[in-house]
């Protein structure tokens, strides 16, 4: 619940009336439900059929499949969010084209991405849970994101850390390695990653 509130603060950073919000990769709809309760006009896209059905029941609205992104009209949304989704996209060029198209003027695209230059990524190496092989098709850094969007009309406004992610990813990494006390060790590594990121700027997720 805390993480959902933090996500909403990032996505809706200023007071807007009747915000039209699209969450791509919405899962079972928890973030969209919170946004709906806050007065947003919500739309979701989810590739997993089971998760999509749960979200539709929870939100009482139709959740789109990824293929339906191309059918969304131009200038449809004030905000588009992708929480750990872009790294799963096979065709980045086409995806970004549609993101530009469906955003309104002065609209915002919010991306959350695992950062493979973070301390926890370097610590766990190939066991880092956020690599999520083979589902993660792209491993992106702050530099690569800037380069990808350099050729678009979208402008990078700000980069903010998702500080809770370092703990979650570190605990998962410990579990993948079948280590004892994975919860405690993950918390310690997540804390150390955040501490180092305060100097380096390389947070576990951005």
Give each language-model segment a name.
Residues 59, 133, 155:
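Residue-level signal for beta-strand positions within conserved beta-sheet cores that form or flank
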Residues 1-4, 12, 118, 184-187, ...:
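Short helical patches
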Residues 158-206:
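A C-terminal cap/extension of S-adenosyl-L-methionine-dependent methyltransferases
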Residues 124-133, 173-179:
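Short glycine/proline- and charge-enriched loop/turn segments
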Residues 3-127, 137-151, 162-164, 205-206:
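Conserved SAM-binding loop
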């Amino acid at each position: 619940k805390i993480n959902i509130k933090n996500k909403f603060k990032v996505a809706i950073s200023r007071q807007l009336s009747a915000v039209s919000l699209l969450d791509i990769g919405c899962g079972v709809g928890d973030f969209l439900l919170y946004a709906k309760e806050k007065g947003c006009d919500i739309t979701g896209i989810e590739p997993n059929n089971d998760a999509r059905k749960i979200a539709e029941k929870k939100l009482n609205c139709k959740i789109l499949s990824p293929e339906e992104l191309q059918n969304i009209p131009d200038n449809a949304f004030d905000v588009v969010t992708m929480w750990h989704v872009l790294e799963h996209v096979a065709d980045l060029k086409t995806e970004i084209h549609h993101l530009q198209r469906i955003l309104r003027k002065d609209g915002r695209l919010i991306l959350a991405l695992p950062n493979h230059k973070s301390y926890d990524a370097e610590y766990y190496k190939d066991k880092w849970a956020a690599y999520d092989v083979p589902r993660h098709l792209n491993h992106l850094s702050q530099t690569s994101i800037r380069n990808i969007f350099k050729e678009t009309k979208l402008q990078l406004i700000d980069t903010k850390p998702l500080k809770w992610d370092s703990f979650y990813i570190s605990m998962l990494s410990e579990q993948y390695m079948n280590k004892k006390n994975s919860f405690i060790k993950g918390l310690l590594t997540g804390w150390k990653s955040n501490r180092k990121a305060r100097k380096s700027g390389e947070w576990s997720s951005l």
